[in-house]
């Protein structure tokens, strides 16, 4: 994936080129949403993306943000992480990796895939194969 690896500044023209390569028409709003995701290198919720985009350009609707995130997911530009039943965030890093989730602050931190080893999987339903393993280690301050 083009945006993975070391964080880099991405200008809007580079973002537009990446969107085109993935078969996505680079509208102004899609470019701004991608800019929020790929320049900040954070795990952002749809509401955080909406707020960030609207603070920098003309009003973007919540529906536009959700539809764009869905499109980016389908084209594998981002990953969706459900960190708890009430919180979904979007990850611009599509390379294999895992996460630490601080349940108090809500902060997610990437764990490189080579720092955590999965020894085995349970038996899978007949006719299926594993498509990936996502591990979220939830932490809280010691008391």
Region locations from a protein language model:
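Short, intrinsically disordered or compositionally biased N-terminal tails of bacterial proteins
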Residues: 1-10
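Non-DNA-binding regulatory cores of transcription-related proteins
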Residues: 74-143
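Short, Lys/Arg-enriched N-terminal segment that forms or immediately precedes the first helix
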Residues: 11-23
């Amino acid at each position: 994936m083009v945006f993975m690896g070391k964080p880099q500044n991405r200008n809007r023209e580079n973002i537009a080129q990446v969107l085109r390569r993935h078969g996505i028409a680079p509208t102004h709003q899609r470019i701004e949403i991608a800019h929020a995701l790929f320049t900040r290198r954070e795990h952002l919720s749809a509401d955080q993306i909406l707020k960030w985009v609207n603070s920098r350009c003309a009003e973007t609707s919540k529906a536009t943000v959700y539809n764009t995130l869905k499109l980016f997911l389908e084209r594998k530009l981002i990953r969706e992480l459900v960190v708890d039943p009430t919180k979904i965030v979007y990850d611009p890093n599509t390379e294999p990796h895992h996460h630490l989730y601080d349940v108090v602050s809500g902060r997610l931190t990437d764990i490189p895939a080579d720092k955590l080893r999965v020894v085995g999987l349970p038996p899978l339903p007949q006719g299926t194969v594993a498509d990936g393993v996502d591990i979220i280690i939830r932490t809280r301050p010691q008391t």
